[in-house]
Every structure is written in structure tokens, then in C-alpha cells.
Amino acid sequence: VGFFGCILSFIIYKCGTDWIDVVLPPAAMGPVVALIGLELSGSAADNAGLLADKVDPRNVIVFAVTLGVAIFGNILFRGFLSVIPILIAVIAGYVAALACGILDFSQVASASWFALPNFQMPKFDMGAIMMILPVLLVITSEHIGHQVVTSKIVGRDLLKKPGLHRSLFGDNFSTMISGLIGSVPTTTYGENIGVMAVTRVYSVRVIAGAAFLSIICSFVGKLSMLIQTIPGPVIGGISFLLYGMIGASGIRILVDSQVDYGLSRNLTLTSVVFVTGLSGIAVKFGDIELTGMVLACIVGMILSLVFYILDRLKLTNDREEA
């Protein structure tokens, strides 16, 4: 699947990215990007243990401490501290979790200092490849959405420089390498986009350095187990803010693009995309299920293309209103 993704990136390299403005205009792209954050908001609350039938008060305390430090740190911190509000919030939440007695260090004590990751030998299965291949469309849609919101955060059009074809190739080539060593496929993550929005650190070198340190840490068994002791309420508290910022970035696309909602097609497009993503509707094709942001993105692309054709044929009533 990663190989086919690399082929797709080559096709995009030859065809360019102008088609994105046709199939995903701002009236569709804005809500799609917003849905990336809004769709994940439920998982943030679930990680924090706030959706359980009986909510543990300790989880609420740890969640509130973490989220509070993240919010006010992002607003009040200056200088070097303004770069690491997320890290400080995690530490504050961890201390609160320790005080509340919800940490378990038993696995840290039993873990070895040096531990190799559990690699598996790859197995070539054409049936499995064909079953997962349709997911490539889903991954590509999500990748485009993530690139757009990242572009808004860093203030540079990443779809043009370095280019969608390069980022998509890197995404799929890394999936190939990951598969060859028996690991899981790689993909872009909204959480990391949220971290960039909060810290305002966009350096490729910093991100590459963090990736290198993560690889080194994976060989230190006790450190890996210590990281796993970070409780759900801490992760949920951080994610609550990060996912919200991604959602706000989608709204920012609509504002910056000055989308005219006096035009029927823009109002209809945004409305349908939002409701499709938030309604919980799911469409199944065999073992593949499309729902949430992915389904909304596909619906938005189809509608945008239809509206574009109708507009070119001068059949829309927006021309009369203009």
C-alpha cells in the first residue's frame, strides 16, 4: 500500500496541485480541517476518563490541573517557557496524578534498562494488500487536510513548497520502510500539529531531533515504561487544548479566505461537510468503513466538483444573486 502511495505522489508531481482548489475549495477545506480536531475531542475526554458512567474525582482533578496549566501557560509564559507550555503542563499533571495516587510504577521496576523493540518479519499477502488499498484514499484525504492546517499554522503553503508530492511520498515511503521491519504503517498525526500550534516551534531540525531521541528512548526499557505511566487524564488534558486548536485552525481558513456565505454553494457546501462529519454517519465498502472527517472530506470533494461543473455551465443561482 505504501508503494502504491508513492506512485500516487508521482502522479500528483506530474499533474500539480491546482485540482485541490477545485475539489477542496476553502468552503469545504475549512470545515474538513475543523473536523480533524472536533472529531478527536471525544477521544480526549475518553482518555481523561470523563465519559465513564461513574467519573473518578481524581481523574477530574488531574485533568483540570493539566488543562489549566496548558491554557494559562500558553497565554502567560514568556521567553523560553513560552516554547514548552505543553511539557510544563504534562509535568504538572503528572505531579497531580502522583499526589492523587493514580500512578503505577510496578512495570517500571520490572523492566530492563536495555530492551530491543519487538520486530516482526514482513509477510507478503496480496489479499491483505488489496483489502487495505482503498484506505489509501482515506490516508491521502487526511494527509491533505493535515498539510493545509499545518500551512496555516506555520504561515507557508506546504502544498507548493516543498510540495504535496514530496510530503505524500515521505508519508508512504516511511510506511514501506516500517512494513519491511514488521512495524505498523506510519501516518500524519493531528496531535503533533496541535503541539506546533501551541509551542510555535516549526523547525524541521527540532522535529527530526525529537524523532531521533524517540528512537533512542525506545531501546531504554525503563524509560519506555516510565513514559507509559503517564495517566489518561494528563493525556486527555493536553489533547483537549491541542484538538481545539486544530478545530480553530479550520475556522481560520474560512476567515482568511474570506468565504462569501452570501453564495448558496458556499453555505451549502460548508453545512453538508460539517453535518456529515459530526452526525456519526458511516458508509461501508466491505471491510472498509468511512466515517467522520474522512467521509466528510470525500463528500465535500464530490459536492465541490459537482458545484464547479454546474457553475461552469452557468446553472447556479449564485450568478443571479451576484
Task: Give the label of every model feature segment.
Residues 1-104, 211, 216-318:
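Membrane-embedded alpha-helical modules
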